[in-house]
Amino acid sequence: MMSEYTDEKFVPEKNRYAETLSEFIKCKTISDERFFDKTEFDKFLSFIKRRFPLVFEKGEYKDFNGGIMIKIDGKSHDEPLVLMSHYDVVQENGKWSFDAWSGKVENGVVYGRGAVDTKGSLAAIFESVESLLNEGFAFSNDLYIISSSREEIAGTDVPDMVKYLADNGVKPKLVIDEGGGIVDPPVPGVSGKYAMIGM
């Protein structure tokens, strides 16, 4: 699935954004224990630390059995914002017209397992926050980036993170969780254009 939406403001960075998502896809972060390979998860974590140095320099990183929590201090510690999107994926199924793990970029589209569900949104979160930090932006409130490594199998990393936040008195003002793609053509069973925001 893809969208033809463009914003000229971001065109100069489009190659970087596509490269980021492509590299995300190349990491076979399959959480199903039958196909699980820890080295692929380690590769993903190593990449984001190199790719987004300011996020990790300015943020406090905690590992929850592969689950990612990064807290970036804002001017206020009250009413933080949480941005969420998981980075694990399911095994490739069915027939693919290309390698599901290639992260192939062609005609402005990045192909592969996880592009929509949901490495695309996670890449957007990291790229946006890194860009803001690079510009010297100061967040009004604390920001948490949270990403599950076990969402597809209903794992314990996010429940553990929720408990950690609760135990430390953190009460988010807003949680934006993955949502879905902005896709054109529409998903099966939906007439017209389609977008979903998870809040």
Language-model features: locations:
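Acidic/His- and Gly-rich active-site-bordering loop/insert found
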Residues: 1-118, 135-139
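General structural signal for secondary-structure boundaries
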Residues: 13, 55, 166-167, 199
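Acidic/histidine-rich catalytic neighborhood of metal-dependent amide-processing enzymes
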Residues: 110, 116-198
